[in-house]
């Protein structure tokens, strides 16, 4: 049981390191907060919450993995190497792909609600 709990401690330490050291991780957290606030305001459904939660976790997980790749590349070489650049670029690309997917999900869920708010000046739950 101790090693199981120790694993959680290590995981939280890793997340804390990413948040402290990576500006983009903090940007993702701000957007996650905005999505949660919008979800509460627009009263998204339970399935929509599940989709939003999965989407946010995918983006943040990609950021964590990108940080791990960058750390390992930096550890492996201190001079420029095109293979190191390719690894770092691929990690950044993975984050970009998940972030673009998250934007698409956000538009699908919040787009009609935001449009109704802009057009009518108010938002009412239409069900």
Tell me what each language-model feature is.
Residues 2-68, 76, 80, 95-127:
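Hydrophobic alpha-helical transmembrane segments
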Residues 74-90:
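Basic, amphipathic juxtamembrane/active-site segments
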């Amino acid at each position: 049981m101790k090693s199981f709990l120790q694993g959680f401690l290590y995981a939280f330490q890793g997340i804390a390191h990413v948040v402290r050291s990576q500006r983009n991780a903090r940007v993702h957290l701000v957007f996650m907060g905005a999505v949660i606030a919008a979800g509460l305001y627009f009263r998204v459904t339970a399935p929509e919450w599940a989709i939003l939660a999965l989407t946010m976790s995918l983006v943040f997980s990609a950021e964590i993995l990108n940080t791990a790749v960058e750390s390992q590349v930096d550890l492996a070489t201190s001079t420029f190497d095109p293979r190191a650049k390719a690894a770092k670029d691929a990690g950044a690309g993975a984050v970009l792909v998940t972030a673009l997917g998250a934007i698409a999900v956000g538009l699908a869920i919040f787009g009609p609600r935001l449009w109704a708010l802009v057009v009518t000046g108010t938002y009412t739950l239409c069900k």
